[in-house]
């Protein structure tokens, strides 16, 4: 049951993250739609948000508690089976999915920050500098591939 609860909690974290990503690309926060300078010509961060939304839905599907499932096994010697291994397998996938959702939020957040002409704290700026060495702002549609 602990793994079921952890999966549900992580699923909720992913869902909240995707909603923040949606808020960034919605055009309602003083940022351009899809976080791209020319949203009519470029789709910007629309597809990463679609991806996050799809992963959130998969997490919801994976979060049906495994602990509610049991079947008699071992020729009737075990009348209640915890299905702990199945819960662990599903939890592992939810962890991977949530990592991807959070990475998509980070991608969108750094893109959004680039549209603001404001400086953050030295600590945040140092993190952004490291991140921007790896990924800079996308001004036009570009292929995004993260090797894991």
Regions picked out by a protein language model, each given a short descriptive name:
Residues 1-148:
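C-terminal auxiliary extensions adjacent to catalytic cores
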């Amino acid at each position: 049951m602990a793994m079921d609860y952890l999966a549900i909690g992580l699923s909720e974290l992913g869902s909240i993250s995707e909603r923040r990503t949606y808020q960034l690309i919605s055009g309602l926060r003083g940022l351009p739609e899809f976080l791209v300078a020319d949203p009519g010509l470029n789709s910007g961060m629309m597809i990463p948000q679609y991806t996050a939304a799809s992963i959130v839905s998969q997490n919801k599907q994976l979060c049906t508690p495994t602990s509610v499932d049991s079947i008699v096994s071992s020729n009737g010697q075990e009348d209640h089976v915890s299905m702990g291994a199945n819960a662990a397998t599903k939890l592992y996938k939810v962890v991977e999915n949530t990592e991807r959702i959070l990475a998509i939020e980070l991608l969108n957040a750094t893109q959004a920050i680039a549209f603001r002409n404001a400086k953050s704290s030295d600590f945040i700026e140092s993190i952004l500098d490291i991140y921007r060495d790896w990924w800079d702002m996308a001004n036009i549609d570009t292929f995004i591939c993260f090797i894991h």
